[in-house]
Amino acid sequence: MLRIESEELRVDIKEEGAELHSVFDKTRGQELLWQGGALWKEQAPVLFPFIGRLQGKHYFYNEKKYPMSLHGFARENTFRIVECEEDSCILELRDTAVTRQSYPFSFRLRQEYR
């Protein structure tokens, strides 16, 4: 878990999915982000390369069929830390042999929190 802070906020970020886990208002002593529940355990997932469910859980590109899970795969992958300071953090996910099995494109997805 990564943490960045300002005078007003404390923010926790998961490396898996580069997901915000907590946004805590230090001035009011209050959590500002949904903390999960029985029906939806995530807080603020990064959805890439698709949002939602594809019909049949797949799509076609250049006459080839590719499987795709609900909301894509970014939230299921560990992002690399590019840079992390006291008050900011940049995380990155790049294509791999595994991601190209369901998304046959080169990509670099960066999430930056300040």
State what each model feature region is.
Residues M1-R114:
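Surface-exposed acidic/polar loop and edge beta-strand patches at domain peripheries
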